[in-house]
Amino acid sequence: MSWINKIENAIKELEGGRFQNLGDAYLRKKYHFQNLVSLGSQEGTDKTTKGIPDSYAEENGKYIYIMYGTHKSVLPKLREDIRLVKEKIYKDNIKEAKIGRIICCHTSSNIEIKQKEELEELAKPYKLELIGVNEIANDLTKLEFQFLSKEYLSISESTEQIWNIDDFIKIHDSSKTNAPISNDYIGDISDIVSWITS
């Protein structure tokens, strides 16, 4: 079985709360969300809680509403999620100009073009982004996401010898025997520049 198939199958087997936690970590990494808030998951667990949206973030001064679904009958769930988010936006009296988009992450790979267009129409006047199991699994095979497949799915094809800079610093600094390298430099930066250029 190929690595991507293993990841897809593992994602489909996740319970709702675990999928939500994976999704939050994935979206945080994919879109560099610094302030993602998980309303739909219980702190410190893989359990879900009631809340609309499941998570939200802010990007360029606009709110991103995020919903997750692990249901086998994905279309009714997506329709319901979109309806609930729109109701919540209306109820909370959030202006349309403050809404960036609605993201729906799901575990299906069977949404046809016509169905996608129907969901986009249903989401109007807001932009809809659908992220399915194929896209998530494909991204989890990329170097910058591989730590997520290991942490949330216990799948690792990497020898863990190559990391992006942020992950390397995080891993390096987490060791009790290493001196941290994430410290800010205090001093005259021109000294460093002159050393490098000389």
Please tell me what each predicted stretch does.
Residues M1-S198:
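Mixed-charge (Asp/Glu-Lys/Arg
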